[in-house]
Amino acid sequence: VKMLAIAEPDMTFSSDREPLEAGLGHEKHITECINRCYAAANDVHDFRAMQMLDWFVKEQGEEEANASDMIKNMELFGSDPKGLYALDREYQARAFVAPTMPM
């Protein structure tokens, strides 16, 4: 296996909010992709695929909500050091829970 270099992102941001908005835009793009897959499965009556995709629909809804919440928090705290410190602590305390997909 040959590991290749990961290219530097070609995006530049002029504010702290812009990367969060880009992240939310990407999450919305992923939602659209999942929805197209779901619609295709529905069109051919592939109910097992639809059942599997239900999990992705739910998870993606949570991802969009998280991205949106980050933007709201940035608007709320802005450049307030104490607020940003508290927000940073809150994000650090979040525990990863491995997703489970019913089979």
Per-range role (PLM):
Residues 1-103:
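Iron-associated oxidoreductase/ferritin-like identity signal
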